């Protein structure tokens, strides 16, 4: 996606960021995460599935920002070592995204048996995912551009 004209990407690993210290998320306000969310037109969340859900750290970090998310596109990628490819984590995140003011795209990407889908350098080895990833990224960019136009030009 970063090869698209006018598109900049940034990878944020929430496991390496300061944790919110209370329900208001004061430790993360004005942090790299908050600033990146404010600047972003779109967000891709890659979430592993744990016991049919997502990890508490993801929920805690997501809840630490609110105004930064309003009317921004989000795409969700589910990851699982099992056969379901994170389908259940995606289903669990959808209502959370809506509550946060994010606009989900209709394409998801699900990586089942993730341990065999990538090599040691993180490169995709299972080419059957390429078409779905392409559709996912095209939809995400379309939604991001459409919502950006709306945020900048349409008063609510």
Where are these regions (language model features)?
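A glycine- and small-aliphatic-rich helix-loop capping segment at beta-alpha/alpha-beta transitions
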Residues: 60-68, 94-99
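Mobile beta-alpha loop/short-helix "lid" or hinge segments that flank ligand
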Residues: 10-21, 67, 100-120
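N-terminal beta1-alpha1-beta2 submodule of the flavodoxin-like/Rossmannoid cofactor-binding fold
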Residues: 1-65, 123-156
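Short glycine- and Lys/Arg-enriched binding-loop motifs that mark or flank ligand-binding interfaces
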Residues: 49-52, 67, 78-82, 118
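Short, structurally constrained coil/turn elements
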Residues: 3-5, 70, 105
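Short, glycine-/small-residue-rich phosphate/pyrophosphate-handling segment
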Residues: 73-113, 127-131
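Short, proline-enriched alpha-helix->beta-strand connector loops that line the catalytic pocket
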Residues: 40, 70-73
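Glycine-rich NAD(P)-binding loop of Rossmann-like domains
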Residues: 70-71, 120-125
């Amino acid at each position: 996606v970063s090869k698209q004209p006018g598109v900049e990407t940034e990878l944020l690993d929430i496991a390496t960021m300061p944790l919110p210290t209370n329900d208001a998320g004061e430790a993360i306000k004005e942090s790299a995460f908050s600033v990146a969310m404010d600047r972003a037109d779109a967000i891709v969340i890659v979430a592993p599935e744990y016991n049919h859900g997502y990890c508490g750290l993801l929920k805690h970090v997501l809840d630490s920002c609110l105004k930064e998310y309003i009317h921004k596109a989000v795409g969700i990628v589910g990851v699982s070592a099992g056969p379901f490819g994170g389908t259940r984590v995606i289903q669990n995140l959808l209502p959370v995204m809506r509550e946060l003011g994010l606009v989900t795209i209709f394409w998801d990407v699900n990586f089942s048996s993730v341990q065999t889908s990538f090599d040691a350098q993180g490169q995709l080895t299972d080419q059957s995912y390429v078409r779905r990833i392409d559709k996912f990224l095209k939809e995400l960019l379309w939604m991001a551009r459409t919502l950006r136009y709306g945020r900048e030009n349409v008063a609510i």
